[in-house]
């Protein structure tokens, strides 16, 4: 018979310190954050939630700035759009996730594919399958693209 050991405990101060370190909030200030530094930070975090509302500033910029005050937006844009070191998907909300983690997301994509297709068919109604086929055909022909590579004449929310 297996013996159960008592659960490990650590003091609250150590638990807080571990949490803060894993969230990138204990690192000393650096002279200047490079694009590679930013990529390592996002990999450490696992993802950065995207916020499209900018009351003061979009939250993902504030999240990254809080971890390094030399954060530069252009590095995030480069990582996402030019280097393709990040991809957008839903964690619990829209997020930027390191492309290095993409293989770990494959099972999630497969598990939810049919549910998402059915949901989008209900939302988009007539023409959804043809639109999806067009998008997939475009990607097969031209490789990975951003959403802005597609029609701009469609109203948002339609």
Go through each PLM region and give its residues.
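Phosphate-backbone binding and catalysis cores of DNA-processing enzymes
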Residues: 2-158
